[in-house]
UniProtKB/Swiss-Prot annotation:
Domain of life the protein comes from: Bacteria
Biased composition annotated in UniProt, kind: Basic and acidic residues: 136-158
NCBIfam families linked: PRK05422.1, smpB
Main location class: cytoplasm
Protein's UniProt name: SsrA-binding protein
Gene from which this protein is expressed: smpB
Claim: RNA-binding is one of the keywords in the record: yes
Cell compartments where the protein resides: Cytoplasm
Keywords: Cytoplasm, RNA-binding
Organism taxonomic ancestry: Bacteria, Pseudomonadati, Pseudomonadota, Alphaproteobacteria, Hyphomicrobiales
């Protein structure tokens, strides 16, 4: 069965909207996920939460921690654990670059988006980020509010 010509290349499953507010995003990259069958079926049903998750290095491997993919409703005894550690697939060069940034410069790796690419593979968009201080968050919020107010004024008067 052919896909429609105007179908989007990426089917969004989950987005971490708080990451851009809580962190200063410095760099992004795409990583694959090692998933079980029932996890993929839950993702196809658009059921996932990556808002409180993060990526970490353990034993030379890259892991996604605290992501939530609920159990598949039609799955029986072969269902998965909803909050299990999930291995991330990243090239060695990217992994070493991220590891050096995280260990030396005090940065963190947070997920931004979870989606299926055009080949139907589950991918995770990761960001190398630095945590914002409280005053930076307030400043960001003030800028956003001012831009909304400017747009409203221009629209009403313009």
């Amino acid at each position: 069965m052919n896909k429609p010509k105007n179908s989007p290349a990426r089917k969004m499953i989950a987005e971490n909207r708080k990451a851009r507010f809580n962190f200063e995003i410095l760099d992004t990259l795409e990583a694959g996920l090692v998933l079980t069958g029932t996890e993929v079926k839950s993702l196809r049903a658009n059921q996932a939460n990556i808002a409180e998750s993060y990526a970490s290095f353990e034993d030379g491997e890259f892991w996604l921690i605290n992501s939530y993919i609920p159990e598949y409703t039609q799955g029986n005894r072969f269902n998965h654990e909803p909050r299990r550690l999930r291995k991330l697939l990243v090239s060695r060069r990217e992994m070493s670059r991220l590891f050096n940034s995280v260990s030396r410069e005090g940065m963190t790796v947070v997920p931004l988006k979870l989606y299926f690419n055009d080949r139907g593979r589950a991918k995770l968009e990761l960001a190398l980020a630095r945590g914002k201080k409280t005053h930076d968050k307030r400043e960001t919020e003030k800028k956003r509010d001012w831009n909304r107010e400017k747009a409203r004024l221009l629209r009403d008067r313009g």
